[in-house]
């Protein structure tokens, strides 16, 4: 038997989402429940994929099945497509398995032509309705199927209204509608040099398949991790009309409030209108509860159906309906999109109502949604009035409003005067850390979602919009330009880190409101998950923040970030330009108390929870100045000649610093650095243990960039010699642990050997991804877009762990490590530690913990619980 590509609504059910798409599956489900659903059929997602395999054509076999089901639809409805006596009109709508509202295309009133319009006018005794439906169809078909500009059709409508001296579409009469039909057809003919077609169904179905790959659908898929291989289904359904007269209408409603979660029907409707009128906002709709005055019978039926649907689907529903001559028809139901606050309230309320279990509640909330709860938000009313000047990548969520500055120094200076600033840069570097920290938000011209700016901003919970190519930078002259408009230093701008929108004025922000539902919901997540969640934190402030968000320790303290602050950088630079180990030790002695104080602060903030401290990782040249003024100043401070300093800087230059003199290689060349860091770690832990004996802190020392067990053995000896001596002298009983990062593929391949020396592994997936792919994270943004456009990659491997390649190394290292040290502790501390899909992978391969930015801790806690629910059955 030939493969089945088409299903009548009553042949399927809601479990068939993968094949019928969300809309088709739910239409089938509603039909099975005996609800008033207009007759129709669904063309499957497999037909969409076949369409692309057949070079964007619908093959004869699929066409034959479509015509067979059209014949069935005509028999059931008693109407025929294109028939003069009793014409059938249909809608052709998309329906992917994941909800993608507004991303793909819809065509209504298909089957309309001049003769059909005349018949409909006679049958309904409503000429205006017939020609209104006809002109809408020409407009939609021309736009969706033939690619003509929507805007020109709107202009033609405005011209006709102006001629008549009217402003409202409702005041257009039957003659006006006839005139619009002729004007629309003339525009169509003029643009496409052909008459408006009589055969329309296959063209419309092809257009919906094509819309799966329109730019906005591709962008939405990328944003929501929806694979392009899923395809969209197409639903062909008999039209019911909300625009036939005053006893007709159309509306959209939610079973609960999608903004607040309140258990009250929420929605809008319009009488004498078609579906898109409600969404388009041309006319102001009425609130749903007013429907009981206008159409009481339809309202009562609708309320009963909403209750039945929510109980059946065990989730808040978003529904579309039409009333034709007083009779209610259901056109769609789906799980409704909702704010994070609403999601938590609905989940908790439904558990209290006995409708769902706590496991179902946990699966109901999208982990990434929790992000928006933790950052300041724009005032919703103010945001509605604002118009974006540009849009770029939403790299770190939140709402930021401040005055433009162009350098980290300016940011620090202005912030010290209590001025709110937005740091605008071509790109950021580690030296900008302090300026970034004091800024309300960060806007970069270059860089992607995992650029330096994005990673650091997320870690700090600072709003960041990156990669805005529309900006022409003239920072030397104190301004940047977008679309010919100049924005000067000191001007107010606002950034929306959730959408990537940039606004040219100040928009009021309000603090994020975390409700009691949040704590209750997260407790359910913590009870369910087996994977521990730690944080990446470099300061006591970050550590405290993460602890409040529920972190169970720190998986990564990047000690180099501490070196960039204030006076410390001078001592670090002094150490770098020293010629002998003795000179280096003098400089390191200055850094020691600062590092020790930082570590004490972090231990205090974490109150006895485990803390993993990574030793110095970046190449030394990153700590040296790059502009001539700073170089001259450093030479003076160091009492050395300018040429001599330039020679040192030049000698540290590397062609490929990512794979150069960094990580454990620095500790091997300069063991005194590891000695100083060990002294700081152990002394800090001993001091805090003395103050809080019940905390029993056991420092975890992590050696970065190990590729061979001999490297680890050498550095470990340096660490243990210092640590053992200090502990012995203190006369306190304190354990410590030495482990390594697995971030070089060779280390993953030799993990069994390395585990003999390492008490724990932490997978540094940022570098492991770079080294496995051979991509530089800082440069990949320049060509990865081509990979996405050409469907070579669907996802950014720096944002979502590459499970097939990098993941295979992680799995291998996990198994090899445990083969020689069964109790080895395993975690992940790259950016992937906060990505739900990557967390699911970590759960599956049996890691002990994930570590992520403080503001991603709640996301990771929920994602870990969802992984346990999915895979521990």
Pin down the residues of each PLM region.
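Nucleotide/phosphate-binding sheet-loop regions of phosphoryl- and nucleotidyl-transfer enzymes
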Residues: 1-386, 413, 419-422, 429-434, ...
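Short beta->alpha connector loops at strand-helix junctions that form conserved
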Residues: 41, 445-447, 466-469, 557, ...
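Conserved alpha/beta-domain cores
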Residues: 93, 514, 524-873
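Flexible inter-domain linker/hinge segments
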Residues: 212, 374-406, 520-526, 530-537, ...
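Structural motif
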Residues: 235, 405, 422-424, 443, ...
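Glycine-rich phosphate/ribose-binding loops and adjacent secondary-structure elements
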Residues: 327-329, 426-437, 441-443, 449-455, ...
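Extended, non-globular alpha-helical segments
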Residues: 392-431, 482-520
């Amino acid at each position: 038997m030939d493969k089945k590509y088409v299903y009548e609504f009553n042949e399927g059910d809601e479990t068939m989402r993968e094949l019928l798409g969300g809309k088709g599956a739910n239409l089938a489900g509603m039909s099975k429940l005996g609800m008033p659903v207009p007759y129709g059929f669904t063309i499957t997602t497999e037909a969409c994929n076949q369409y692309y395999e057949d070079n964007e054509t619908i093959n004869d076999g699929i066409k034959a099945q479509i015509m067979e089901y059209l014949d069935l639809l005509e028999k059931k409805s008693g109407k025929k497509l294109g028939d003069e006596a009793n014409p059938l009109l249909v809608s052709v709508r998309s329906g992917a398995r994941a909800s993608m509202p507004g991303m793909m295309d819809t065509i209504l009133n298909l089957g309309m032509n001049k003769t059909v319009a005349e018949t409909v006018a006679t049958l309904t005794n409503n000429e205006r309705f017939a020609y209104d439906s006809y002109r809408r169809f020409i407009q939609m078909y021309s736009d969706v199927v033939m690619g003509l500009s929507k805007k020109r059709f709107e202009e033609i409508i405005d011209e006709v209204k102006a001629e008549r001296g009217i402003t409202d579409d409702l005041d257009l009469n039957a003659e006006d509608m006839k005139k619009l039909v002729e004007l629309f057809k003339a525009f169509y003919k003029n643009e496409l040099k052909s008459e408006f077609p009589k055969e329309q169904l296959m063209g419309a179905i092809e257009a919906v398949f094509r819309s799966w790959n329109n730019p906005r659908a591709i962008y939405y898929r990328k944003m929501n991790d929806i694979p392009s291989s899923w395809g969209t289904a197409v639903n062909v359904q008999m039209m019911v009309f909300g625009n036939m007269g005053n006893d007709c209408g159309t509306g959209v409603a939610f079973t609960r409030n999608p903004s607040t979660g309140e258990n009250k029907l929420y929605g809008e409707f319009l009488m004498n209108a078609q579906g898109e009128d409600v969404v388009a906002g041309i006319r102001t709709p009425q609130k749903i509860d007013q429907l009981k005055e206008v159409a009481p019978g339809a309202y009562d039926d609708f309320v009963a159906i909403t209750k039945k649907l929510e109980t059946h689907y065990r989730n808040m529903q978003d529904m579309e309906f039409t009333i034709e001559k007083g009779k209610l028809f259901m056109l769609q139901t789906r799980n409704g999109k909702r704010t994070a606050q609403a999601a938590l309230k609905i989940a908790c309320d439904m558990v209290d109502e006995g409708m769902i279990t706590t496991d179902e509640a946990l699966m109901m909330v999208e982990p990434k949604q929790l992000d928006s709860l933790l950052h300041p938000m724009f005032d919703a009313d103010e945001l509605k009035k604002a118009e974006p000047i540009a849009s770029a990548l939403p790299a770190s969520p939140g709402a930021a409003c401040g005055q433009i500055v162009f350098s980290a120094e300016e940011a620090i200076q202005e912030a010290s005067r209590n001025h709110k600033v937005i740091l605008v840069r071509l790109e950021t570097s580690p030296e900008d850390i302090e300026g970034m920290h004091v800024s309300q938000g960060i806007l970069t011209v270059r860089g992607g979602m995992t650029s330096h700016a994005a990673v650091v901003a997320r870690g700090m919970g600072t709003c960041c919009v990156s990669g805005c190519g529309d900006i022409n930078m003239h920072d030397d002259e104190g301004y940047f330009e977008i679309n010919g408009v100049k924005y000067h230093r000191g001007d107010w701008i606002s950034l929306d880190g959730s959408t990537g929108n940039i606004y040219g004025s100040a928009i009021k922000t309000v603090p994020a409101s975390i409700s009691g539902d949040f704590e209750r919901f997260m407790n359910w997540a913590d009870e369910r998950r087996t994977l521990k969640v730690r944080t990446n934190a470099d300061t006591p402030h970050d550590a405290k923040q993460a602890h409040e968000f529920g972190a169970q320790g720190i998986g990564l303290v990047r000690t180099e970030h501490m070196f960039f602050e204030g006076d410390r950088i001078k001592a670090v630079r002094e150490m770098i330009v020293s010629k002998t180990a003795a000179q280096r030790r003098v400089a390191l002695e200055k850094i020691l108390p600062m590092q020790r104080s930082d570590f004490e602060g972090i231990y205090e903030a974490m109150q006895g929870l485990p803390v993993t401290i990574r030793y110095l990782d970046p190449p030394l040249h990153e700590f040296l100045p790059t502009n001539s003024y700073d170089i001259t100043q450093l030479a003076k401070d160091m009492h050395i000649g300018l040429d001599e300093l330039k020679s040192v800087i030049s000698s540290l230059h590397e062609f490929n610093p990512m794979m150069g003199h960094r990580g454990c290689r620095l500790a091997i060349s300069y063991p005194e650095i590891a000695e100083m860091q060990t002294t700081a770690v152990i002394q800090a832990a001993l001091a805090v243990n003395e103050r809080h004996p019940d905390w029993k802190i056991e420092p975890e020392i992590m050696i970065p960039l190990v590729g061979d067990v001999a490297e680890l053995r050498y550095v470990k000896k340096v660490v243990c010699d210092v640590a053992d001596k200090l502990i012995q002298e203190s006369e306190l009983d304190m354990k410590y642990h030495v482990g390594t990062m697995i971030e070089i593929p060779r280390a993953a391949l030799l993990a069994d050997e390395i585990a003999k020396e390492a008490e724990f592994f932490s997978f540094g997936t940022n570098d492991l991804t770079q080294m496995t792919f051979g991509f530089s994270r800082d440069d990949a943004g320049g060509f990865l877009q081509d990979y996405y456009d050409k469907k070579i990659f669907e996802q950014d491997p720096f944002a979502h762990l590459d499970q097939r390649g990098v993941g295979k190394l992680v799995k291998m290292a996990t198994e090899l490590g445990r083969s020689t040290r069964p109790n080895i502790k395993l975690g992940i501390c790259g950016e992937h530690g906060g990505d739900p899909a990557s967390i699911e992978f970590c759960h599956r391969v049996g890691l002990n913990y994930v570590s992520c930015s403080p503001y991603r801790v709640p996301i990771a806690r929920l994602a870990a619980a969802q992984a346990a629910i999915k895979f521990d059955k």
